[in-house]
Design a protein with these regions (language model features):
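Periplasmic c-type cytochrome electron-transfer domains
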Residues: 1-240
Length: 240
């Protein structure tokens, strides 16, 4: 699942861009039978009933939304909250503002390599991604001959255009060291694997320079920011 941190900067939501904005995105999980057990639009009434069981919370909610819990107000509230999930002040942010000591020499070399390879062409904007849709298999068979699923169609599932097949929203690179697994199909478990895939399928390189990979990883790790003044941390939730 894509991270919700900095999602407010994305032009579209989800890997396939099926949600035009945060509010549409917020309406997806509640009506996904796999995620929350509901499926039909009428199920918002059941969700509202559960939320109303907490009378104190319901009273507070009505101070902002006098009409109470509805599909519209619930998703609007979630979207407004997600707009606060911004993670500025990463070491790289501080470096760009003039603090030469904010990142290591290897990270600086990695940044120069990032630019040399043209990575910023797609990973652009305040979130360093989320602005465009690109082909996963631009320079090679990303899927490696494996059986493809409907999710592998990418943007085509939304636009119904054959030319959008295998196009996916470029992910943000902010906090990327914490947002594994990578790719739309979670086929890369580490940054090194993700970079290797990009080298091959996006840039068309057959041979991989391990030193360059280490430099790029050093740079990418400087993109981890802060939330409400505290460093963002990656914590694995226990299985239910």
């Amino acid at each position: 699942a894509p991270t919700v941190f900095n999602a407010a900067f994305h032009t579209k939501q989800f890997w396939d861009g099926r949600a035009a904005n945060l509010q549409e995105q917020a309406g997806g999980p509640p009506l996904n039978p796999v995620e929350m057990g509901y499926e039909h639009p009428d199920d918002w009434n059941k969700i509202a009933a559960k939320l109303n069981a907490d009378t104190a919370f319901a009273a507070e909610f009505k101070k902002v939304y006098p009409q109470g819990f509805t599909g519209e107000t619930i998703t609007n509230a979630i979207a407004e909250y997600e707009k606060t999930l911004i993670t500025p002040n990463s070491p790289f942010d501080r470096y760009l503002k003039g603090d030469e000591n904010a990142i290591s020499e290897n990270a600086k070399k990695g940044y120069r390599l990032f630019l040399k390879l043209g990575c910023q062409t797609c990973h652009t904007g305040p979130a360093m991604g989320g602005q465009s849709f690109e082909y996963a298999d631009l320079k090679g068979d990303f899927f490696g001959g494996r059986a493809k699923t409907n999710d592998d169609n990418g943007l085509m599932n939304f636009t119904k255009k054959e030319t959008d097949k295998h196009r996916f929203r470029v992910p943000t690179l902010r906090n990327v060291e914490l947002t594994w697994p990578y790719m739309h199909d979670a086929s890369a478990q580490t940054l090194e694997e993700a970079i290797t895939k990009m080298y091959h399928y996006q840039l068309g390189y057959d041979k991989l320079d391990k030193t360059e990979v280490r430099l790029l990883v050093a740079f990418l790790k400087t993109l981890t920011g802060e939330y409400q003044g505290k460093p963002v941390r990656g914590e694995v939730c226990p299985a239910p």
